[in-house]
Every structure is written in C-alpha cells, then in structure tokens.
Amino acid sequence: MRRLCLLLATVLAALTGVVALPATSALAASAPPSSTGQRWALKVNGVYVSAEVNDSGDQNGKLRARSTTVGSWETFSLHTDNISGVGYGTTVSLRNEENGLYVTSEVDTSGAQSGMLRARGTNSGSWERFYVVPQGGGQFALKSAANGLYVTAEFNYTGGDQGLLRARSSSVGSWERFTFVPVDGAGDTGMPPQSSVTASGRHDIASWNVCANNNPSAACKLQYVDGDTVGANVASGVNGYLNHRPEAIFFQEICEKAVKPLELELESRLGGGWDVRFAPTYYKVVATDGTSDTGLLAQKTCADSTSHKDRGSFGIALAVKDTNTWYRGYTLPSPDKKEQRPALCATVPETGTVYCNAHFSSGSYFVDGNQAGDDPDGISRRKQSDALKGIVDKLQERGYTPFLGGDLNTTHASVDVLSSLYASHQECGQPTPGSPHDGAPTDGNNKIDYLFGPTGATYACEVVDPSLSDHRMIHATITL
C-alpha cells in the first residue's frame, strides 16, 4: 500500500490488553468492500438495477431498474447475518458497491414511494433483510422481511421514479422476477504471469487466528471490538512477539473493516509497504422452499461492535508486500448449510513467491453434549486439503515458490486428512520431510494451525502467544 503511514493517536499500554483507540472516521470510511467477495448485478425486464447515489435527501441511494450496463452503481454483494433460532443463510442483505451501504426497505414511507428500496443502511436488520423465492428459470423474487411483501420494479412510473424498486406486492409477476448476474469479485480472473525469479534465501511467514468476531471464549480479547482497535492490537502483537519481521502473515477469524486499519498499523509498526487483502466466509443462500442449491452465496457478517458499528463480513486476511500484482479468493468445498470456507492467495513477483491462506471447516467438538463441528468425520477437510493443493499446484506451475497454511482445524489425531499437503510440501513442525507430523500446540493442547513450504528446505518453527486470542501465533522460518 503506497500511502503515508498512520500516525498513532494512542500508544498501547500493554500487549496483553485491548486498548480502545478513539473512533477514526477516515478509517471507517476507507474500509474497502470485500476484496474478493462475489458481486452481483440485479436484472429485471432486461435492465439492471441502479442505486441513485447522486440523488439528495430522502431520495439518496434509491434503487431503480433503468441501466443497460453494469458499473459500481449496479453492483451488489450479498450478506447474511444471524437470526436467533434460525441461523445464517435464510435471508440476504444487499450491499451496494458504490457507497458500501445496505439496501433498506423504507416501510415507513407513504404514498407512491411506500416501501421503496434505498442503499442507505449502515447495519443489517429487519429492514435490510430479504427472503429469496425461486421462480424457475434462474429467476427469483425478493420478499422484504420488514413487511412480507415482494419487491416490484415500477416500470409504469415516469421521470426520476421510473423503474423504482418498492416492497409492495403480494404476488409475483414479471416486475417481481429478478436475475442475479455474476460480476466477478474473486480477484484477478486469470493466472499470474510466469515468474521470472527463482525464490531463494530465507523466508519468514506467520499465521494467526485472531478470534476477532464474537467467540465467547474469555481468551478472545478482540471479540466485538471495532476495526481500528483490532488493527492496532493485532499489529502490536505481531511486532512484539516475533523476532523477525515476517514477509507474509495469514490471519483468520477477522472482520472485513479491520483490514484497512490493520494495513496501516503494520506499516507503522513493522515498516515498509503492506497490502492486506480479505476473503469472506460464505453461506449458501437458502430459498424459502428450504433448498440451498440456489447458486447464490452470501457473505457471513460479523456481529456488530459493542458501539453498534457494522464490522463488515467475517473471513480471512492475507498481508504481503504491497508489490504484489495478483491475488485471488477461492471458496473451498464445504458441508452444505454450513460455513463455506475461504482460501486467499497472492503473488510477490520480485521474490518469485506465492502465499496462500486458508481456514478449513471445524472438526469434531461438543457444546452441551451436542456435536457442534461442521466436519466431524473429516470428509470436507480432506476435500479442502485437496482443493488447496490443486490451487497451489497451478501457481507453482507458473514458476512461483508456494508458502501456504492457516487454521486447518485438524489435530494430530486426524492429520491424515491433510495427506495431500504433506505429500507435496513440508510443514514447519517437521525438521525433515520424513519427520512426524508434529509441532507445538496452537489452540489449547492441540496443534491446528499449520505452515507449509517446499520439501527439503531448512525449517524452524515457533509458537508464540500475544494473549489476544484463543489461538497462538505460529511462525515459520524457511531457508531455501
């Protein structure tokens, strides 16, 4: 990231405590849309829906079906938040790419604009939630959770309200049938250029599940805190507990709006230019008929901060030098109606390296005597391991030396589910390729965080505890 480093307003008093920084509106405003999240355009009767972000007053951000092309005004990402007793994925919220705000059903508006849709919500609640109702042929109706009515495009309106979207119909006709048209948001669509550099020398990579959403564990000091505070504390933990400045850092369980503050804080504390990218965790959108094969994915939202600020989506982040020219997010094969887990890769052409961060599905664990893991039998984690290897293999074919890992949610007892990774890479807990799959614990008494690199290199692996998360940070020094 080529910009001036952030001037810290507050010095952290202790690395083990969370220091609440003053609200920084510039950082909140500059928090990017999900770097690699899927994006969609909505099409009805042959035209695309636009958010009129240049309109003023109570018309600002109103949605109209009126465009023949797709730009940022016509681009939306889908999000899903937790509904008590129901969970994620049963409703979606739409966030506009241009202004970063959620689409709201204005159910308190009266007259001809009653129930009109506007991109103006800073949080997702009942006014921002919509049920997805399949109509066949790849079309869907949207039913507002605020008033139980279908969204209609008012093609008979004239002037500035022509094509206005309103939640006002009790039945579905052609004006209520929408098509979600994918607008690629995964990152670069092609592969990176062939590397002209052969990686050599020493490489330092770290990985840390920072537990910064709403985990109730007392060890998760960053639950429900805002992005500025997460960025400051996480960067301080990296800086204070590692003996060497890492060249790449993998983060898991982080909220989207902590990404920009984290980037600035890494630059301030570690020096140099950093580029921090984000990839969301998804849920398959569950239609009103109970099916989850709609083809739509919605990003899991982080719980709001204690100050009721929206913290964006939940997922993983990858910090590398700001000279990287290629990045891409992936959705790994995951259990149906569970979290659809992400991977995120970025190249650094000047060193001939590529870095891939992943967060695999949770294994077997119990809450109140009930199985709470997404993948207790390891079937999905094995598929995720195979998929990550396939991603890395293609990048390696382009001449890049890969470093990969993250929170793979796999203990030594079930490490065979990672066999495809061990077959072609060496893990930092292994002094030699043939050494046991071993290493210091990273979560309680278990090792579930891993860092891999080329086989045959010289490896050193340490685990440190900045006391901010229920996970410890794992740090690999790999000499080629």
What does each model-found stretch correspond to?
Residues 204-210, 220, 237-263, 319, ...:
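Active-site beta-strand/loop signature of hydrolases that rely on acidic residues for catalysis
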Residues 1-30:
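Secretory targeting and sorting signals
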Residues 29-58, 72-111, 126-158, 174-190:
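Extracellular glycan-recognition/adhesion modules and their associated mucin-like linkers
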Residues 96, 144, 319-322, 344-351, ...:
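Active-site beta-strand termini and strand-to-loop segments that position acidic
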Residues 191-193, 390-403, 409-480:
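Metal-dependent phosphoester-hydrolase catalytic domains
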Residues 191-193, 197, 254-352, 360, ...:
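Structured beta-strand-rich core segments of catalytic domains in phosphoester-bond hydrolases
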Residues 342, 346-381:
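Metal-dependent phosphoester/phosphodiester hydrolase catalytic core
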Residues 23, 183-268, 278-293, 300:
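N-terminal, active-site-proximal structural segment of metallo-dependent hydrolase catalytic domains
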